[in-house]
C-alpha cells in the first residue's frame, strides 16, 4: 500500500467519526484519534523515505569476495617481499690488505647483485640510470706530528663516453690542530669521512673509492669502511 492511499484512508475515517461523535466527549475522542492518525501517517512516511533512499535495508558486504578484495597492506608486503631486479652493490674493505684500501664482496654483509661487478678494485655499472653512490672510511691515529695530517677520501668515475677519471665526491679533513708537545701523552684521535650523492651513470662506467693515507685506516670494527651503489 502506498503512502497516498494510507493518508486517504485515514482522512475518510476521521470524517466518518466526526459525523458520529457529538458533544465535548466526542470532540475529545476525535482529537485523540486525529493525533494518533497523524503520528501513524508521519511514521509511515518516514519509513517510506528511509527505504526509498536506501538509508536502511539489506546490509552490503564490506569485504566482497574475489580478487578485488585484496588488503592494501598485505599487497604492499607481498610486493616488497619480491626480489628487486635493480642493480645494487655494497663492498667492504679487506682488513688483511696492509697499506692499501682494497674492496671485497665475498664477506659478511657485502653483496654484488643484478649485474654489478667488482673489477680492478672498481665497481662496474651494468645499466644506464640514476644511482645513489656512497662510501665511508674511518681514520685513526695516535698523537699529532709536527707536520699537518690531511686525510682525503674521493669517489671517482671513469665514464665510457670519455676515458678520464673525474672526481664525483671528495672530502678532506685534518685531525690535528697543533703538534703534541714533547713529553705529553699522545692521545688517540678518530676521523670518519662519509660521501654520498645521486648521479646519472652509463653502462660500463667504472667507479672507485680511494684515500690518500691507508696506514691510518681503522679496521677495529666491521662496517666502518665500505663503498656501494644503488640503482634508483
Curated annotation (Swiss-Prot):
Q: Where are the transmembrane segments?
A: 36-56
Membrane protein topology class: Single-pass type II membrane protein
Disulphide linkage map: 144-176
Lipid attachment, kind N6-myristoyl lysine? 19-20
Main location, first listed in the record: membrane
- Glycan attachment sites: 80
User: Which residues bear the site annotation Cleavage?
Assistant: 34-35, 39-40, 49-52, 76-77
Identify the Pfam families for this entry. TNF
**Which keywords label this protein?**
Cell membrane, Cytokine, Disulfide bond, Glycoprotein, Lipoprotein, Membrane, Myristate, Phosphoprotein, Secreted, Signal-anchor, Transmembrane, Transmembrane helix
Please name the PROSITE patterns in this protein's record. Answer: THD_1, THD_2
Where in or outside the cell it occurs: the entry states:
Cell membrane
What does the UniProt PTM comment say about this protein? Answer: The soluble form derives from the membrane form by proteolytic processing. The membrane-bound form is further proteolytically processed by SPPL2A or SPPL2B through regulated intramembrane proteolysis producing TNF intracellular domains (ICD1 and ICD2) released in the cytosol and TNF C-domain 1 and C-domain 2 secreted into the extracellular space. The membrane form, but not the soluble form, is phosphorylated on serine residues. Dephosphorylation of the membrane form occurs by binding to soluble TNFRSF1A/TNFR1.
Q: Which residues form the THD domain?
A: 87-232
Any single GO CC term annotated in Swiss-Prot or TrEMBL for this entry: phagocytic cup
An example GO biological process term is: positive regulation of interleukin-33 production
GO MF entry, a single one: identical protein binding
**Family of this protein:** Belongs to the tumor necrosis factor family.
What this protein is reported to do is described as: Cytokine that binds to TNFRSF1A/TNFR1 and TNFRSF1B/TNFBR. It is mainly secreted by macrophages and can induce cell death of certain tumor cell lines. It is potent pyrogen causing fever by direct action or by stimulation of interleukin-1 secretion and is implicated in the induction of cachexia, Under certain conditions it can stimulate cell proliferation and induce cell differentiation. Induces insulin resistance in adipocytes via inhibition of insulin-induced IRS1 tyrosine phosphorylation and insulin-induced glucose uptake. The TNF intracellular domain (ICD) form induces IL12 production in dendritic cells.
Q: How does it assemble?
A: Homotrimer. Interacts with SPPL2B.
Q: By what name is this protein known?
A: Tumor necrosis factor
Amino acid at each position: 500500500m502506498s503512502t497516498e492511499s494510507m493518508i486517504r484512508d485515514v482522512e475518510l475515517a476521521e470524517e466518518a467519526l466526526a459525523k458520529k461523535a457529538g458533544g465535548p466527549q466526542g470532540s475529545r475522542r476525535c482529537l485523540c484519534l486525529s493525533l494518533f492518525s497523524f503520528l501513524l501517517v508521519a511514521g509511515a512516511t518516514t519509513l517510506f523515505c528511509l527505504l526509498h533512499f536506501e538509508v536502511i535495508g539489506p546490509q552490503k558486504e564490506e569485504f566482497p569476495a574475489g580478487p578485488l578484495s585484496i588488503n592494501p597492506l598485505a599487497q604492499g608486503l607481498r610486493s616488497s617481499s619480491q626480489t628487486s631486479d635493480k642493480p645494487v652493490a655494497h663492498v667492504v674493505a679487506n682488513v688483511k690488505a696492509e697499506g692499501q684500501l682494497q674492496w671485497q664482496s665475498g664477506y659478511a654483509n657485502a653483496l654484488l647483485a643484478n649485474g654489478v661487478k667488482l673489477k680492478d678494485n672498481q665497481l662496474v655499472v651494468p645499466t644506464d640510470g640514476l644511482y645513489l653512490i656512497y662510501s665511508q672510511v674511518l681514520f685513526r691515529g695516535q698523537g699529532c706530528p709536527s707536520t699537518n695530517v690531511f686525510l682525503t677520501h674521493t669517489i671517482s668515475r671513469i665514464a665510457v663516453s670519455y676515458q678520464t677519471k673525474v672526481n664525483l665526491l671528495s672530502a678532506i679533513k685534518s685531525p690535528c690542530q697543533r703538534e703534541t708537545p714533547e713529553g705529553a701523552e699522545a692521545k688517540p684521535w678518530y676521523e670518519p669521512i662519509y660521501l654520498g650523492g645521486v648521479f646519472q651513470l652509463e653502462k660500463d662506467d667504472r667507479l672507485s673509492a680511494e684515500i690518500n693515507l691507508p696506514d691510518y685506516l681503522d679496521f677495529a670494527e666491521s662496517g666502518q669502511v665500505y663503498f656501494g651503489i644503488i640503482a634508483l
